[in-house]
Structures are given as structure tokens and as C-alpha cells.
Amino acid sequence: MLYNLLLPHIHNSHIANLFHYITFRSGLAIIITLSLSFITGPILIKFLRSLQKNGQPIRSDGPESHQTKVGTPTMGGIMIILSSCLSTLLLADLTNKYTWITLFGFISFGIIGFMDDYAKVTKNNHYGVRGKSKLLLQGIISFIICVLLEYLDKSPSHLLNVPFFKNLSLDLGYFYIVFAIFVIVGSSNAVNLTDGLDGLATVPIAFTAGSFALISYLVGNLIYSNYLQLTYIPNTGELTVLCAGLVGSCLGFLWFNAQPAEVFMGDTGSLSLGGVLGIISVITKHEIVLAIVGGLFVIETASVILQVYYFKATKGKRIFKMAPLHHHFEKHGWAESKVVIRFWIISVIFALIGLSSLKLR
């Protein structure tokens, strides 16, 4: 909004001219989302506590230390969604189609997550909305987004870029739509599975969003994309502002979500954040890089899949003491804070590996 209002005056005012730069607006987005989180956090937490008598249901078969979390409210992802969307509406170019497509997906996945959290709180169990129903809704939203990109996007939308290789792209044809849906839905659920400890998912999400802030900026810049031999996709630079807002809102949320958490982001936050990262990776044609940068989410998801299939194949045996993987280490006696910090370190390593693919070709 501010960008569009100030655009006619960029040549007459130094202040207005600053808004012409994506980097300035991105930095401002971080400041705004952080500030909004600090201001609205206590109010939202108090409101959620008044509505949720028992807070988020805690699994009885989980680590014993988790019973101390009883009564902690969920749906804190509302804070992240509101602050990120407000900063994007204020600072991004509202004539940019990618801005609106991404916001649509972000909010839609947030609504699905809210429905799931609401079902858990009202039923007082950790099951919520049926898994198949959630997958169906996620698939429908992802399909709509892919169709919008297919008909509104003039970029090479069927190409899958392979990182670390020069000019290597696979043309998936119309199968790319199926692949893109898988990326978006998979990303959404992978983040959801990772969000099991205080602050565990928040920092890796911030690292991933920060990485895609850089990727969006480079892909949307003709000079930088040519220099790095990336597929140039005009106008994706505006997604940098949204990604920066995600970084700020996640860091602001971490203030209240650090152990011991005052609030959980819930599926409202995890499904929406995972979904929006998947959408941005599809738009920027860096789907495989998302799997690298978000390697922690991939590992957590793989641990669940392996556990389930091995359990069925062996009729009751398990690979891990408990899945997802972070619970396995808790069962081994690791303190929650140790698991969280070590997983943060792993996520930093994955982010650096993913970003190195931009240059190593």
C-alpha cells in the first residue's frame, strides 16, 4: 500500500525513493512484524487463554516432560499470519500477482490449520480434523494456486531446475502441476510434523524464509539471475518483502514460544508457514532447493514415514523410540532445550548448503 502510494513521488522525495528499493522495504518488514508481534503477543495470548480452558491437548503417550505443557494455549500462528500479512500489504507492490497468490495460499492454509486447532481444543484431544480431510483441502488450495500460476504466469512454469548443475532443467510438462501440488502440501505437513517442541520449528522456518528472501530477490533480478545462471522470473523480487516479514514474525513469535512456551503456533501456524514456503519455492522454481534448505523438515517427515511403514511391515517393531525424530531423542534422555538447539544448528547447515547451490554450478 505504502509502496503504491509513494511510487508517483519517488523522483521528488528521498523518503519516497527509499520505498523503491526491495531491500529497504524488506528490512522495514522485519522491523514491523517484530514490533507487531511484541505488541499483540501478550494480548493474543491472554485472549486465547480465556477461550481455551485446557489449552492444546497433550499426548498421553509422549515424553513425560510434556505434561508440564498442559494448559498452554494454541493457535498462536494467528500472530504470525496477521503480522506477516499486514507488513506485506503495507510494503509490497499490490499490483504484483505473486503477492496476492502467495497471500491467498498463506491465509487459506492458515484457515485449514485453524479448523484443525479448533477441533482439537473443543474435543479436548490431539486428533483434530481427519487427516484425509486436511489433505483434501490442502490439495484443493494447492491445485487452485497451480492453475492460477499456469494461466497468469508467462515464466517456464513446467521446468524443474536441478541445483548444483549448470543449465540443467527437466521439463515435466503438465505433470509439473501434480509435482507442484506435492511440494506445497508436503512442505505444509513437513513443518507441521516438526512443530513438536518449544521453538523447534520457529527458527528453521525463519532460516528457510530468509533463504527464500534472497532467492526471490536474485531470481527476480535480471542482472543477478544471469550472473548466477538462475532462471529469470520477472516480479518475483516482491516475494522478498513477504519472506522478510515471515522472518520477523517468526522471531517475534519465538519471544513467546521459547521454552517454556507461553503459546503454541498450532496447526494454524505450522500448516500456513509450510504451505507458503512451498508456494514460494514453486513460483521461484527452487523446489529442490527448498528440500535442501528445509532439510530438517524432510528428516522429521522421513522419520514418521519410516516408523509407520516399518511398524506395519514388522507387525509392531519400531525403528525409533518415538516419531517424529525429535521425540526419539527426548526418549533417549536429551533435554528438550538440547534437542531444539541442536536441531537449529542442523537447520543452519542445511540453509548454507541450499544457498551454496546458487553459486556452485
From Swiss-Prot:
Catalyzes the initial step of the lipid cycle reactions in the biosynthesis of the cell wall peptidoglycan: transfers peptidoglycan precursor phospho-MurNAc-pentapeptide from UDP-MurNAc-pentapeptide onto the lipid carrier undecaprenyl phosphate, yielding undecaprenyl-pyrophosphoryl-MurNAc-pentapeptide, known as lipid I. Pfam families: Glycos_transf_4. HAMAP family: MraY (MF_00038). One of its GO terms (biological process) is cell wall organization. Belongs to the glycosyltransferase 4 family. MraY subfamily. CDD domains: GT_MraY. It is an enzyme of class 2 (transferase). Keywords: Cell cycle, Cell division, Cell inner membrane, Cell membrane, Cell shape, Cell wall biogenesis/degradation, Magnesium, Membrane, Metal-binding, Peptidoglycan synthesis, Transferase, Transmembrane, Transmembrane helix. GO terms for molecular function: metal ion binding; phospho-N-acetylmuramoyl-pentapeptide-transferase activity; UDP-N-acetylmuramoyl-L-alanyl-D-glutamyl-meso-2,6-diaminopimelyl-D-alanyl-D-alanine:undecaprenyl-phosphate transferase activity. InterPro entries: Glycosyl_transferase_4, PNAcMuramoyl-5peptid_Trfase, PNAcMuramoyl-5peptid_Trfase_CS. Its EC number is 2.7.8.13. This is Phospho-N-acetylmuramoyl-pentapeptide-transferase. The keyword Cell membrane applies. The chain crosses the membrane at residues 28-48, 74-94, 99-119, 133-153, 168-188, 203-223, 236-256, 263-283, 288-308, 338-358. PROSITE patterns: MRAY_1 (PS01347), MRAY_2 (PS01348). It comes from the Bacteria. It is a multi-pass membrane protein. GO terms for cellular component: plasma membrane. It comes from Rickettsia massiliae (strain Mtu5). The keyword Metal-binding applies. Its cofactor is Mg(2+). It catalyses: UDP-N-acetyl-alpha-D-muramoyl-L-alanyl-gamma-D-glutamyl-meso-2,6-diaminopimeloyl-D-alanyl-D-alanine + di-trans,octa-cis-undecaprenyl phosphate = di-trans,octa-cis-undecaprenyl diphospho-N-acetyl-alpha-D-muramoyl-L-alanyl-D-glutamyl-meso-2,6-diaminopimeloyl-D-alanyl-D-alanine + UMP.
